[in-house]
A protein has these predicted regions:
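Eukaryotic partner-binding/assembly regions in large regulatory complexes
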Residues: 1-82
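Short, amphipathic alpha-helical interaction segments positioned at domain boundaries
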Residues: 170-207
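Short alpha-helical segments that sit at the start of domains
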Residues: 10-15, 81-117
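A short, conserved structural fragment
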Residues: 62-70, 147, 151-163
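Short acidic, glycine/proline-enriched loop segments that cap or flank alpha-helices
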Residues: 108-116, 134-138, 159
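Short amphipathic alpha-helical interaction segments
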Residues: 49-57, 135-152
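Short acidic, hydrophobic short linear motifs in intrinsically disordered regions
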Residues: 34-44, 111-129
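Accessory beta->alpha helical hairpin/"wing" motif in late/C-terminal subdomains of nucleic-acid enzymes
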Residues: 76-81, 157-184
Length: 207
């Protein structure tokens, strides 16, 4: 492992350090991300760098008690393991995550040609109401904070301005959501929220 690092140029060492920090901070790396300026999906430079050093990085994280996995069909590289950063989410963030996963699975089952799925804030809120998952409508501040958190973890991309959120506000659901939640777990959590009669809605949950 030390020999591998010594053979890298200073620029490559700097890139490798950056990739390690990024993975520790956000868990996921996406092969393609949406570029709002160009209104299209573009290749992620960090993903390419990670692929180039994948074997070394897998050994590096294994020593630290984590596993670095690559899901080639969906273009996602991600960390798993007890020592990997868990997604600490508020109740609203957890609910949004569950509903995003439901929407993602439904659209993918309709023979979608893309691993990235589009939805709207309005659809999210409609689903939340139909499942009766919250007693009160979340404030705009809570919604903005929640969407920003999910964006940080590379779960979604927010296509419209955060300060102008409306029902028509568009979101992209990235394939990384399938690495966070599996079908049975989604239904289990949804049922627990439906049955919940009281409790602190801002209590963090680890996913």
């Amino acid at each position: 492992m030390i020999t591998y690092i010594e053979e890298l140029s200073d620029e490559e060492k700097e890139q490798l350090t950056g990739i390690i920090r990024t993975l520790l901070a956000q868990t996921f790396l996406l092969e393609r991300k949406y570029d709002k300026k160009g209104s299209r999906f573009v290749f992620n430079k960090e993903y390419r760098i990670c692929c180039r050093h994948l074997e070394f990085l897998q050994e590096y994280f294994q020593v630290a008690g984590m596993e670095l996995k690559e899901n080639t069909p969906t273009g996602v590289i991600y960390l798993v393991g007890e020592d990997a950063q868990a997604l600490r989410l508020t109740k609203l963030a957890t609910i949004y995550l569950l509903l995003l996963k439901l929407i993602y699975d439904e659209q993918m089952s309709q023979a979608s040609t893309s691993v990235n799925i589009y939805t709207t804030l309005g659809e999210l809120n409609e689903r939340m109401g139909s499942f009766r998952l919250l007693k009160e409508r979340p404030s705009p501040t809570e919604v903005r904070r929640t969407l920003t958190l999910l964006k940080k973890y590379q779960i979604i991309e927010i296509l419209d301005a955060l300060d102008e959120l409306e029902s028509e506000s568009r979101l992209i659901i990235y394939p990384s959501i399938s690495m966070v939640l599996f079908g049975d777990r989604v239904q289990e959590l949804l049922q627990s929220f439906e049955e919940e009669s009281d409790g602190n809605e801002d209590e963090p949950a680890a996913i």
